[in-house]
Design a protein with these regions (language model features):
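Extreme N-terminal starter segment of soluble prokaryotic enzymes
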Residues: 4-11
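Short polar catalytic/cofactor-binding loops
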Residues: 13-18
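Cys-nucleophile CN-hydrolase/nitrilase-fold catalytic domain and related Cys-dependent amidase chemistry
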Residues: 21-22, 29-103, 108-109, 172-186, ...
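Short, acidic/polar
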Residues: 23-32, 149-156
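Structural motif
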Residues: 40-41, 141, 164
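CN hydrolase (nitrilase-like) catalytic-core segments centered on the catalytic cysteine
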Residues: 65-83, 150-225
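Active-site catalytic loop in hydrolytic enzyme cores
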Residues: 89-160, 174-181
Length: 225
């Protein structure tokens, strides 16, 4: 691990209004207003605007759709980077697409590689096939999604490519022990900072969530404040 300038990361751990993009965007706008000037990166849960829904055909948007267009405006307005994931459509396929939007208008995205078959995600979405490393404020950031956490080879930090590993998730209560243990394990084995962001509340499939969002140092120490 090299010595770098510090970076301020804020986690938004929240309930998600089921399949209601407009309301979830409204609630996010309120939270971003309160974070103006206090942080450099805001991290949202997986599928922050809909919840972990399999209604890909009715909820999907292109990169040029309202959700990403709105977030681009807010990243510029509030002068912070925003990352999370949403239901995307691209070339006739549907993806659980993670995004990273900078105040300068840069847009990076990563399509979830490991789809959660037990939740039938693979029946409604296509898997991505490449990682992305995002340069931001002197840091290199790797952005992954939920079930990717269970596949350590996919996140392997070969040649110290990245400094911060971000997982955005909808990780339910029955599997919380795995979430807690694997986030710390990824920090230790990759010698990097790890940020995991989960939701709260209950989704439309009656799965319950209790957060547990955390940031770990490369030494496995929890540094969330």
């Amino acid at each position: 691990l090299t010595i770098m300038d510090s970076i301020r990361v804020s986690i938004i751990q929240t309930d998600i209004v089921w399949e209601n993009k407009q309301e979830n965007l409204r609630l996010l706008h309120e939270k971003l207003q309160s974070l103006r000037g206090t942080t450099e990166i805001v991290v949202l849960p997986e599928m922050f605007s809909t919840g972990f829904s399999m209604q890909s055909q009715t909820l999907a948007e292109p990169n040029s759709g309202k959700t990403i267009s709105t977030l681009k405006q807010w990243a510029s307005l509030f002068q912070l980077a925003i990352c999370g994931s949403y239901i995307a459509t691209d070339n006739g396929q549907f993806y659980n697409r993670a995004f990273f939007l900078t105040p300068e208008g840069e847009y990076y995205f990563y399509d979830k590689r490991h789809l959660f078959r037990m939740g039938r995600e693979a029946e409604h979405f296509s898997a991505g096939n490449k990682r992305i490393i995002i340069p931001y404020h002197g840091w290199n950031i790797c952005l992954l999604v939920c079930y990717d956490l269970r596949f350590p080879v996919w996140s392997r930090n070969v040649k110290n490519e990245y400094d911060l590993l971000i997982y955005v998730a909808n990780w339910p209560i029955p599997r919380r022990l795995a979430w807690d243990a694997l986030l710390r394990a990824r920090a230790l084995e990759n010698q990097c900072y790890v940020c995991g962001v989960n939701r709260t509340g209950m989704d439309g499939y009656h799965l319950k969530y209790n957060g547990g969002s955390k940031i770990y140092s490369a030494f496995g120490e929890e540094i969330t404040s």
